[in-house]
Amino acid sequence: MRGASYVRNTAETRISIDLFLDGKGVYDGTTGIGFLDHMFTLLARHGQLDLTIGCQGDLEVDTHHTVEDLGICLGNALAQALGDKKGICRYGHAYVPMDETLVRVCLDLSGRPFLVYKVKIPVERVGQLETEMVEEFFRALSNRAGMNLHIHLLEGGNGHHIIEAIFKAFGRALRQAVAIDPDNAGRVLSTKGVL
């Protein structure tokens, strides 16, 4: 199984992540932010990856340090799990509807980090999670994973539905991108020869 473990300890957070790309879609652990745990459950299920998180953060301040550092850690674990990226499909995309909401996520595991985030969430928080932290999570993740990531809200009105559709679509797009392409086995999908 392709996987990695990553640990990050700072004055603000203590985080450990175990990631297995060829998993059963299981999330285990707690971030201290209930809604974010729900999102990681969806990400794991739709990405068919196994994700275990241990996290202690300074949530008495707010969720910023915890959420951003989780993005950093997951991005680093993903980069480690992919290694030289030989044989992967590299690209992935998904549209996910949820009632009135429609989200599109497209990504490229190119080694060139860039985030395009075209999402307006009409509420300031869902549960304990400040909604502006969704963008910060994906920015940190894309930077550390070396991922070009586009997230677009095409239709939507309910904050919970929007964030849920984003995490589901990201999981499904990631599942496509990390899949092994039998026609490209042992090769990197780039004319440069590296990603």
From Swiss-Prot:
Gene3D superfamilies: Imidazole glycerol phosphate dehydratase, domain 1. Transmembrane segments: none annotated. Its EC number is 4.2.1.19. One of its GO terms (cellular component) is cytoplasm. It comes from the Bacteria. GO terms for molecular function: imidazoleglycerol-phosphate dehydratase activity. Keywords: Amino-acid biosynthesis, Cytoplasm, Histidine biosynthesis, Lyase. Its main location: cytoplasm. CDD domains: IGPD. It catalyses: D-erythro-1-(imidazol-4-yl)glycerol 3-phosphate = 3-(imidazol-4-yl)-2-oxopropyl phosphate + H2O. Pathway: Amino-acid biosynthesis; L-histidine biosynthesis; L-histidine from 5-phospho-alpha-D-ribose 1-diphosphate: step 6/9. It is found in: Cytoplasm. One of its GO terms (biological process) is L-histidine biosynthetic process. InterPro entries: IGPD_sf (IPR038494), ImidazoleglycerolP_deHydtase (IPR000807), ImidazoleglycerP_deHydtase_CS (IPR020565), Ribosomal_Su5_D2-typ_SF (IPR020568). Belongs to the imidazoleglycerol-phosphate dehydratase family. PANTHER family: IMIDAZOLEGLYCEROL-PHOSPHATE DEHYDRATASE, IMIDAZOLEGLYCEROL-PHOSPHATE DEHYDRATASE HIS7. This is Imidazoleglycerol-phosphate dehydratase. It comes from Heliobacterium modesticaldum (strain ATCC 51547 / Ice1). The gene is hisB.
